[in-house]
Amino acid sequence: MRKLKTWFFSLFIIIILTISATSTVVLSKNIMKSIETCKGFSNNFYFVHVTDTHVMDDKFDNGFSKMRLRSVLENVTSFEEKPAFVVITGDLVEWGSSRSGALNYQTFLDCFYEKDNQLYADKGCSIPVYMTPGNHDYFWENNLDNYHTYVDKNHIADEDRYIIVYGDVSLFFMDSGANYLKEPYTWFHPYGDGLFDDDIAWLEEQLSTCKTTHKIVLMHHPAVNVRDDSGVMYDVIARNRMRFISLCEEYDVDLVLTGHTHCSRVFDADENLLESYPFNCSEYSTLFVQTDDCKEGVHYRNITVVDDDIWLEKCEEIKIKHPHDKSAVFIRGSTSIYKNIYLYILYWVINYSLNKTIQP
């Protein structure tokens, strides 16, 4: 019995040492308190933010959306100095539900490489890709079943909340939800259904115990945006918006990286629009960032960590040749209700056709 205990203890020590030697650690909420920042890695690196890729199966758009995503991935992985990782903040596919949504996700996955249940941007599997869902990933049946089947099986129990620690930076990934439908006036500029009270409680717990110098929150919907002529702020999270902003300020979050608006904007907590790139985040309180999409154009943004500073760079656009694609023309545009009505009709027509031609 004593030998057996010694063997188990030795095995436990080996596992702990193996985990601590990994450069990037994915932390679930159940073990967050027991693991600290990985040691021995340079604090000088950069990563790439991509968002709103809106991929569809080749049958639905002649391969145009897949070409856009592949273009940005091929571009950022061709740099002489490679990014440490890539993050994609939602709307991975144009719609995510049912059989046609499954086809969209399969096409999305064709753009990546996979090893040990982790997606990578490069063939050598040295640049991991981390993701969070957007409202389109819920379309149209208001669930993430296909997202969890094809993209992320690891964080279902944690409600798609997880943390990546790289060097002295913690990245908090959150799900800002499906479209918020309780107020009809918001349907023209859809709010995110989150963040719920348990999301806020989770974030506060993790921020309060975070050991790293830098903190970055990533989700699909912004918390700060422009206001219309009547003073209403659209396209943001519908719940706990001010609580979320206060938490970010209280715990010195450097950046909140989002998408959804298909625009490039940077705000502070007081809703001031900032435009002097690049930003040294050390000189600001929390910056609330919207990165431009990969649907109406092909965009990405670099975030660079140099010693004790994080530098936010402007969005870059990749010019690609646009094939003649009627479906792409119809669905391009803002997140308006008219585009969503078109997509809803298209979704049901496609699924009706699939149900007629594909046996269960």
Task: List each model region and its residues.
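N-terminal Sec-pathway targeting helices
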Residues: 2-12
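Short, flexible/disordered intra-domain loops and linkers
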Residues: 58-65, 97-104, 183-190, 227-238
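Active-site neighborhood of phospho(di)ester-bond hydrolases with catalytic His/Asp-centered motifs
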Residues: 49-51, 86-91, 128-135, 216-220, ...
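Extended active-site neighborhood of metal-dependent phosphoesterases/phosphodiesterases
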Residues: 97-210, 243-249, 255, 266-314
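A short C-terminal boundary segment appended to hydrolase-like catalytic domains
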Residues: 40-41, 301-360
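N-terminal active-site segment of His-dependent metallophosphoesterases
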Residues: 30-102
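Hydrophobic core
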Residues: 13-20
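Alpha/beta-hydrolase fold active-site loops
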Residues: 45, 84, 161, 168-169, ...
